[in-house]
Amino acid sequence: MVKTQRVVITPGEPAGIGPDLVVQLAQREWPVELVVCADATLLTNRAAMLGLPLTLRPYSPNSPAQPQTAGTLTLLPVALRAPVTAGQLAVENGHYVVETLARACDGCLNGEFAALITGPVHKGVINDAGIPFTGHTEFFEERSQAKKVVMMLATEELRVALATTHLPLRDIADAITPALLHEVIAILHHDLRTKFGIAEPRILVCGLNPHAGEGGHMGTEEIDTIIPVLNELRAQGMKLNGPLPADTLFQPKYLDNADAVLAMYHDQGLPVLKYQGFGRGVNITLGLPFIRTSVDHGTALELAGRGKADVGSFITALNLAIKMIVNTQ
């Protein structure tokens, strides 16, 4: 790395395991400065519950970034709206969570931070607080005014991007248009090159229907939409294989010759990835003007403050963000 960079972290729902995981992250050295956008008392209380040392250093944006030493975090303070009891949601803190996301996102947009890593949020409590919220991905897309973003989950062995994300099944076929596929594949191809350092990305594309439509006998979306788009993009030099039946695509003879898979919808691709590497996966938002990675699990309220939360996904998300920073320098 040419110089030390700052990475901003949002712990997510304060009553969940996010603060626990951030405290656990702090127990090792990191080659970047970890700036945590959170309430100071929340972090120190959670560290005490876990019996782990934690020193919070004030965030100084005008000073050079320093590698993080074990037992420390750099704090960018955002105040809680209500006291926190581990494992018990407080609707008032839905506003706090969104404030941390907004400040971290704005810091990435203005160049303060080289990447953003997000802990798990509780969408229900944010909406109960009167804030319409469907997820991190959509929030950052709107706030950064990105034209289009793509959700991708990854383990060490597999990357799966989604053409559509949080849609009911009955709406998916209508959502998969030529324009959408052009945009999604272009973003996936671009970010695999620029953020992952893959010179000529090889992308496997799932069909929408069983057996990828079986020549039109089980649906015509492949013939009408997916195949024409893939042919156009192949003519531009992209290495695309598909559409392939999703039930046979996820095997070594295909995956060994691919850098990523494009699934048509959420539950087509993600169950395979999560079965293979649950707790080791990373959620990546492609198409943003900054690097954003996230854990692949939820708030686990029942584990908060008990020292039983697995920090593996957070470590993987941070390590991947650091690699992506290096690739973009």
Curated annotation (Swiss-Prot):
Residues at which substrate binds: 136-137, 274, 283, 292
- Co-factor(s): Zn(2+); Mg(2+); Co(2+)
Q: Which reaction does it catalyse?
A: 4-(phosphooxy)-L-threonine + NAD(+) = 3-amino-2-oxopropyl phosphate + CO2 + NADH
The record's annotation in SUPFAM superfamilies points to: Isocitrate/Isopropylmalate dehydrogenase-like
Give the record's keywords alphabetically.
Answer: Cobalt, Cytoplasm, Magnesium, Metal-binding, NAD, NADP, Oxidoreductase, Pyridoxine biosynthesis, Zinc
Q: Where in the cell?
A: Cytoplasm
Q: Name one GO biological process term.
A: pyridoxal phosphate biosynthetic process
Predominant location category: cytoplasm
Question: Any signal peptide, and if so, which residues?
Answer: none
| Binding-site residues for a divalent metal cation, renumbered to this chain | 166, 211, 266
Q: What class of enzyme is it?
A: oxidoreductase
Q: Which GO MF terms are attached to this record?
A: 4-hydroxythreonine-4-phosphate dehydrogenase activity; cobalt ion binding; identical protein binding; magnesium ion binding; NAD binding; protein homodimerization activity; zinc ion binding
Stated role = Catalyzes the NAD(P)-dependent oxidation of 4-(phosphooxy)-L-threonine (HTP) into 2-amino-3-oxo-4-(phosphooxy)butyric acid which spontaneously decarboxylates to form 3-amino-2-oxopropyl phosphate (AHAP).
Please state which protein family the record places this protein in. Answer: Belongs to the PdxA family.
On subunit structure and binding partners, the annotation says: Homodimer.
As a miscellaneous remark, the entry gives: The active site is located at the dimer interface.
Name of the protein: 4-hydroxythreonine-4-phosphate dehydrogenase
Species, as recorded: Escherichia coli (strain K12)
